[in-house]
Amino acid sequence: MRCPFCRHDDTQVVDSRVSEDGAAIRRRRRCSACDKRFTTYERVELNLPAVVKKDGSRTEFDCRKIVASMQLALRKRPVAADAIDAAVARIEYQLLATGEREVRSEKLGELVMNELRGLDTIAYVRFASVYRRFEDVSEFADVIEEFRRASPAKTPRKR
């Protein structure tokens, strides 16, 4: 690795350690020319696919946008931030597992909806109403009916 001080190509690793979070390797290096020391970090590079929008334009995948849209759908709902982070991690994993270089925004929206379905039904309906551009109350009723068919009838709890 090239020395950042003198630009010499010959450096030696003096010490290597795994970072506290386990996501990187920290290496202390020494330049054989100027004898200065510096630190480098080695991390896994994840190549998430580019997002192809409805108009055909392409943009980098940004997990912050997914988190923000999920937080908006989950606003004032009893869902922990850790659950949102875990859902986003599952979405990223699914995207990486495809091996594709691009993902259509529609597919990404479906992945978000599937995660919200498991987290909170109200948030799912909120997100679906915006994502699918509901224009009529009957569309809300259709989604609610979907849930009723998918989940078995619950017996009311005694108070």
Curated annotation (Swiss-Prot):
A GO molecular function term, named singly, is: DNA binding
Q: Which GO terms describe its biological process?
A: negative regulation of DNA-templated transcription
Q: Does the keyword Phosphoprotein apply?
A: no
| Stretches assigned to the ATP-cone domain | 49-139
Question: What are its cofactors?
Answer: Zn(2+)
Q: Record's superkingdom?
A: Bacteria
InterPro entries recorded? ATP-cone_dom, NrdR-like_N, RNR_NrdR-like
Report the stretches of sequence that form zinc fingers (unnamed).
Answer: 3-34
Cofactor binding annotation: Binds 1 zinc ion.
**Keyword annotations:** ATP-binding, DNA-binding, Metal-binding, Nucleotide-binding, Repressor, Transcription, Transcription regulation, Zinc, Zinc-finger
Write down the Pfam families for this protein, in alphabetical order: ATP-cone, Zn_ribbon_NrdR
Give coiled-coil spans as residue ranges.
none
Q: Which HAMAP family match?
A: NrdR
Q: What PANTHER family does this protein map onto?
A: TRANSCRIPTIONAL REPRESSOR NRDR (PTHR30455:SF2)
What is the purpose of this protein? Answer: Negatively regulates transcription of bacterial ribonucleotide reductase nrd genes and operons by binding to NrdR-boxes.
User: So what family is this one in?
Assistant: Belongs to the NrdR family.
Protein name listed in UniProt: Transcriptional repressor NrdR
Instruction: Supply the source organism's classification.
Output: Bacteria, Pseudomonadati, Pseudomonadota, Betaproteobacteria, Burkholderiales
